[in-house]
A protein has these predicted regions:
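Conserved ABC transporter NBD signature motif
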Residues: 106-114
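Helix-to-loop junction immediately C-terminal to a conserved catalytic motif
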Residues: 98
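ABC ATPase nucleotide-binding domains
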Residues: 120-281
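Non-catalytic connector elements of ABC transporters
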Residues: 2-3, 38, 287, 297-412
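Pre-Walker A (P-loop) beta-loop-beta motif of ABC nucleotide-binding domains
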Residues: 70-81
Length: 412
């Protein structure tokens, strides 16, 4: 099934006229879940028993802090993706925008209007949930029309909007069916259609593809991109999947433990990660990390690992000089696709060779560091076996240098 992209642009095709665009501003937003009776002692004891989870819990005298110091300006018609591991606060943030969670502190503005205390129904937003949230006893048509009926929209207008949305999503043939007769992908289309007919200022999506299998998820991801161009509104999308974030977002907000780690375009967060967490979270396979030495010689910078030494690029040297970075021990990051098998360089032992079709993923051990090297099959001169010794190198232009003390990228 595909979105109906053969139609004329929506403005010419009778799209719902009321769809408007909006800016969204979140200013120093904080969310604390207060303790209920007896819960404070339990939470503190849990943190003491599991010290490795203290940061995730963020237990204070106020309660459990879910989101902190969250500030973001979302432009008109922008597609923003909130991404991060489970428990990072991304869904909580989305629910605060929707009005489903109270904001403990900070300001939320939609089109310049403060909406902290405005109920969800009056915020002019629509939300698509992970579990579809369809009424099982209603047909697809009735599900899509339900919110409009509650607003006492005339029947003729309801019919027009429902059929327009159904045509966009290519679900016209299912309008008389009930949800149980639909596949997961078709149900998700209905959930999206129900949001479209409301003509919202802001469209919110909370992990809408996570219940789908991998193949259908890939198809729906591409079609959400097409849909975004058709309805032309502001999107805030939540996911834990960095592939979804990279392919869908105009900008990505990467979160961890309730804090924003970095905001940027997909290219910015991939090529210039702000810290060790972002570097390891964005990109598949994950970035390789090494204990290394950063060496400054005048205005030149070199990195040295396992006896291999290379100079950083002029752009990186310029940024390090601006920050007056001195020689120090660092965590060095290099992506697998930027790591090359070579005649000389860092020595490593092959542990696993994964044939991926157009490339081989070599899993090697270099002085205790697990390293992945992506080798294009066109560059292979033979097969790699477990126990083989290989050497790898990398260019200074693709090396990322992180502080051992703070985990921050030293170029920032």
């Amino acid at each position: 099934m595909r979105l109906n992209t053969a139609r004329a642009p929506l403005a010419e095709a009778g799209r719902p006229e009321q769809i408007r665009m909006a800016t969204v501003q979140l200013k120093n937003i904080k969310k604390v879940y207060p303790y209920i009776s007896g819960e404070q002692k339990k939470s503190k004891k849990k943190a003491e028993d599991q010290p490795q989870k203290k940061i995730n819990l963020q237990i204070t005298d106020e309660g459990v802090v879910a989101v902190q110091q969250f500030s973001l300006d979302i432009k008109d018609k922008e597609f923003i993706v909130l991404v991060g591991p489970s428990g990072c606060g991304k869904s909580t943030t989305l629910r605060m925008v929707a009005g489903l969670e109270e904001i403990t502190d900070g300001e939320l503005l939609i089109d310049g209007k403060l909406v902290n205390d405005i109920p969800p129904k009056d915020r002019d937003i629509a939300m698509v949930f992970q579990n579809y949230a369809l009424y099982p006893h209603m047909t697809v048509y009735e599900n899509m029309a339900f919110s409009l009926k509650l607003k006492h929209v005339p029947k003729a207008e309801i019919d027009k909007k429902v059929r327009e949305a159904a045509e966009i999503l290519d679900i016209t043939q299912y309008l008389n069916r009930k949800p149980k007769a639909l596949s997961g992908g078709q149900r998700q289309r209905v959930a999206i259609g129900r949001a479209i007919v409301r003509a919202p200022k802001v469209m919110l999506m909370d992990e809408p593809l996570s219940n789908l299998d991998a193949k259908l998820r890939n198809e729906m991801r591409a079609e959400i991109i097409k849909l975004r161009k058709r309805i032309d509104t502001t999107f805030i999308y939540v996911t834990h999947d960095q592939t979804e974030a990279m392919t869908l977002g105009d900008r990505i907000v990467i979160m961890k433990d309730g804090y924003i780690q970095q905001i940027g375009t997909p290219q910015e967060v991939f090529n210039h990660p702000a810290n060790l967490f972002v570097a390891g979270f964005i990109g598949m396979p994950v970035m390789n990390f090494f204990d290394a030495q950063l060496i400054r010689e005048g205005s030149k910078y070199f990195v040295e690992v396992g006896g291999y030494r290379t100079e950083l690029s002029a752009q990186k040297e310029e940024r390090l000089l601006k920050n007056d970075v001195q020689s120090q021990e660092i965590t060095l990051g290099v992506r697998p696709e930027h790591t090359d098998v070579s005649d000389s360089g860092v020595s490593a032992t092959v542990e696993v060779a994964e044939m991926m079709g157009s490339s081989v993923h070599l899993h090697v051990n270099a002085d205790g560091h697990d390293v992945i090297i992506i080798v294009p099959t066109t560059e292979m001169t033979g097969n790699y076996e477990m126990g083989d010794t290989v050497h790898f190198s990398f260019k200074g232009s693709v090396a990322h240098v992180f502080s051992k003390e703070t985990d921050r990228n030293l170029e920032f």
